[in-house]
Amino acid sequence: MIGLGTIVNVGTVLIGTTIGILLKNGLPKRFEKTVMQGLGLTTCFIGIGGTLSEVLTIQNGEIGTQHTMLLILCLALGAVIGEALNIEQRLEDFGAFCQSHFAAKGDSRFVEGFVTASLLFCVGAMAIVGALNDGLNGDPTMLIAKAILDGVASILFAASLGKGVYLSIVPIFFYQGGITLMARFIRPWLTDVLIGQMSCVGSVLIFAISLNLIFNSKLRVGNLLPAIFLPVLFFFLARFFPTLGTL
């Protein structure tokens, strides 16, 4: 069944968030900071590992790099597009709208929970590659594995950030579901290299999210989201400008 992985993912986040909300009521305030930092450290290593797996190469016993210029161009151009569209502010506005209608009074971290969880659950390599596998091959295995991880993460997020994590199922459904459906139409042009490049950019964004979690910084990761899909643009442009294919 096409899209099964995304449906399972939505279900595990709903269950995990519910468990986290129940735990939140009995979780001392001093635990929250440590829980978030622990989740941030885990996220950090996931992001670094995903990036290095695509950037580093080993040939004839020597370590080299690949796709570094492409990565720089995607992030720079993606930032320009994202800032022009003001994606993160739109996410926050949507979260604030839902907070005003559905959140309990005093739930001051509702928007933060929605934005942080949505970005983490959507920008990673597993979301991209898993959704593509589901669409191309009808294989939801990777998305189901991601669903389990997201379920655990949603427990921790909800325990610290509250009910806003529930709302992350909306971007999960449309983002992963959209990639799955899109994969059916762009199947002839997708290559392992292209998928790897998209995953690499996504892993860098995961690392950026980890900095927000650990240091409570304000990197606007949402405005970098277009960067994930720019390797597709460079792939098609390389047909007319072969030099781009060497980035």
Residue ranges, per PLM feature:
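Intrinsically disordered, low-complexity non-transmembrane regions of multi-pass membrane transporters
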Residues: 1, 29-30, 85-113, 245-247
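Structural signature of hydrophobic alpha-helical transmembrane segments
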Residues: 2-15, 66-73, 135-147, 190-204, ...
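Alpha-helical transmembrane segments in multi-pass membrane proteins
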Residues: 8-16, 20, 24, 40-41, ...
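Cytoplasmic-side transmembrane-helix entry/capping segments in multi-pass membrane proteins
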Residues: 31-41, 95-97, 166-175, 222-229
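A generic, lipid-embedded transmembrane alpha helix
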Residues: 39-55
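Helix-loop-helix junctions within the multi-pass membrane cores of secondary transporters/permeases
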Residues: 99, 108-187
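Membrane-helix boundary connector in multi-pass membrane proteins
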Residues: 211-222
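Juxtamembrane boundary at the C-terminal end of a transmembrane helix
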Residues: 235-247
